[in-house]
């Protein structure tokens, strides 16, 4: 599967939409725009081709779903009902776009050196990032927006699964509601987990649909965490960061794991365990 074949596959899958397609050969991107108002999304083809090698049609299905939802929400600019809207925080990498395609600046708060906080209107199956113009339309201040978002993320359920690898405990939040990574902003939840930790607590948001928390009890745990975050980072539709963050009572500190325990890191039993964990989430997504 090459870039041009993937371009054609996506066009075939999206041909039922009332849109036009524009392919940029230099950037290897496909622009899908509504015919009625010209608004749309731009998809980078090359990363999809790379993921297709391991994920096959699953990654194509995800992209098609994302485009369909985005194009549907671009029918009109105005929010029809601002009385019952749900404001949520979403995490993005510092390299993520600061403006939309029309040049409108998104509302952004700094979080860590590896993460920024954006704000979104929840639309059920998707969400729409809030820009400065929409903030005025909502008649909210930035502080009010932030308070509403943090209040709402604290109301989310925090279901998680646990796994033990080489004596280290790993917690996985993967509800697939679009806000798994956002739960890193729930300080009360993180403090509850920290109270259970016997070693150093690390957290990671490799992509928007997972939050990983680790209780690192020995040196091998750092290598396991590094491998784990990289695995999730490369598989995520909206990647955030492959680095872990040290956590202590509301304070985050980005850390870079050098991988000194390379022999232990490459232990086949550890790798097999990590792959099984990742595939568990892939199978969950397919259901």
Swiss-Prot record:
Pfam families: DUF1444. Belongs to the UPF0354 family. This is UPF0354 protein SSP1020. It comes from Staphylococcus saprophyticus subsp. saprophyticus (strain ATCC 15305 / DSM 20229 / NCIMB 8711 / NCTC 7292 / S-41). The lineage of its organism: Bacteria, Bacillati, Bacillota, Bacilli, Bacillales.
